[in-house]
Amino acid sequence: MPDLNLTVPDYPYGAPCWVDLLVGDVERAQSFYSDLFGWRWLAGDAATGGYTMALLDGHPVAGISRKPVGAPIASQWTTYLRVGQIEVAEAAINAHGGRTLGRPVPIGALARTLIALDPGGAYFGVWEPGDLPGSGLLDEPGSLTWNELLTRDYDRVQSFQLGVFGHEFTDETENGGPRWATAHTGDGNPAYGLAEIDDEWPREIPPHWVASFATNNVVPALAKALDLGATLIQGPFDGPYGVGAVLSGPEGEVFSILVPDLD
């Protein structure tokens, strides 16, 4: 069994702190992401409801769960935002036009989680930390480096994020193109990107969060991902948050690889 290192970065309120993957074929997904990012897997037990975590150099960096058989749920990566008391976040989400899906769920002593939809329909989670405040690594190859929220309801979602999580936004829109902004947590640090899905996008693309995992060089990382069976959606591109590419994994789950711009 891999050793577990629970030393993690300090995540302020409202910051993306964890991601997990919901898929039908867990074993296939584990093989894909192990080969791509070098992850090892720590199997869950009864106390965590079978929740399995990906480890990188002993640090927890992501989770994985199996979809219920026949459930009408897309395979997807979920971004979790850090909160204090999850019941307070639950009330705020519903009060500001979002919708919580079910009740808070404990993952043993690690954390309590809650899944919700924002007013634009994007699926996300909130994370009340216990023994696990979040991902043990950031910006290292194979670990989470950035998150982006894409929405068709830009103004309402921006107001929702401000009301629930206190996020302030710096507008980054250029030359009359689709609106986008950088969200900041209360400490002033950048937390994630917010981008508008405008009429140029295909209508079938839903609002969603995209988790980006760090790499040192996007070209060989992309080639490796494609060789493992990923599908290229967009890129490579030189974007506002680094050089990256958007991909879909074995079950169509969307994620990004990114050489982060840490300047």
Predicted region positions:
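Core segments of cupin and vicinal oxygen chelate
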Residues: 6, 11-59, 95, 103-111, ...
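A generic structural micro-environment signature
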Residues: 28-29, 43, 70, 89, ...
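Short, flexible domain-boundary/linker segments around small modular repeats
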Residues: 58-65, 193-194
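Vicinal oxygen chelate
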Residues: 1-11, 15-24, 52-53, 68-92, 94-148, 170-190, 196-201, ...
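Generic N-terminal helix/loop capping motif
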Residues: 36-43, 67, 83-86
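Extracellular/lumenal glycan-associated surfaces
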Residues: 38, 210, 256
